[in-house]
Amino acid sequence: MRIVRLANFVAPRSGGLRTALRELGAGYLAAGHEPVLIIPGDRDADEQTGQGRVITLRGPRVPCTGGYRVLLRRRRITRLLTELRPDSLEVSDRSTLRWTGRWARRHGVRAVMVSHESLAALIGMALPWPGPARILADRLNRATSRAYDRIVCTTGWAAAEFERIGARNLTRAPLGVDLDTFRPRRPQARDGVLLVHCGRLSPEKKPQRSLTTLASLRAEGLRARMVVAGDGPLRDRLERRAAAEGLPVTFAGFLAGRAELAALLGSADVVLAPGPAETFGLAALEGLACGTPVVASAESALPEVVGDAGASVAGEDLSAGVRAVLARPEAARRAAARARAERFGWAAAVRAFLVVHGARSAERTSA
């Protein structure tokens, strides 16, 4: 089966979505299918990779996103889809690619929309009025539900906005984690508590909450420091705040090496996941796989993923959750974190997504 996938907001230095696309594509390929990924970039390209064929089309930068690009060349994309003749279409975008569902229906192609974000949550951050924000999100989600054969959500939290409008084509399929790369390390003796914030430093991720948490813990007398792994438009502001408040924060930037990231996550006492609009949280799951408990925003989907292997806290300050986690014996909390992550292997995620595409796991690639 030829599965053509389209996505926006994917860059060499992006995180969760890029990881999900890579792992799912590699899984489709290993199962005997032909995945083709179409993404935006600074120039056109076409290459064979470990996740199958990847076609990059030149697309403009989106202001205030730290370099993300989108696909806008609709005629070019239409010609490309016609040439590729997909058996199934998988779209990981709800902005400039919403029209692809209608194209697929006209051409008799199965179309799947993967919801990697909550429109209700994102619009709610942009609009100060909950009522209009919800009405707008519901209107857009109804249009999406009508345009695609299946809507895939990775958690119940992500699915809630589609359940609210009565969408009948909704499917739950979790993402996964590389349990071999992200694994527990031998504990290292050190002085104090190490917190790690791993994620894009952008407004919707609320990274300032991690600094607030660190400041609260230190004000209570806890010897804590933090490493921030990630980059984005808020980095300069966060660095200035940390310096002004005298907070011991190391800004490591984007870590391209997965082994390097795994080593950092495994060395931490707690991973912070403060974003209120996270629909799954791959970085948090990678922390769990390394045996590190996660303290997450109670407003997000992370409580579903983390379970009892961490804590969830509402509001700007996650310090109460950190204290609760640190009160548990270290060996027990690390074992619980790893056990939780082992429920989310990529093999199971690939199988679930192939079911949505109507594909058999051992089907041979189409000619």
Locate predicted features:
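Aromatic "clamp/platform" in nucleotide-sugar-dependent glycosyltransferases that forms part
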Residues: 276
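Short alpha-helical donor nucleotide-sugar binding micro-motif in glycosyltransferases
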Residues: 254, 263-268
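Conserved donor-binding/catalytic core segment of Leloir-type glycosyltransferases
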Residues: 186-216, 227
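Short hydrophobic beta-strand element within catalytic cores of glycosyltransferases
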Residues: 293-296
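Carbohydrate-associated surface elements
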Residues: 157, 176
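Nucleotide-activated donor-binding/catalytic signature segment of Leloir-type glycosyltransferases, i.e.
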Residues: 236-255
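A charged, aromatic-enriched C-terminal amphipathic alpha-helix characteristic of glycosyltransferases
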Residues: 331-358
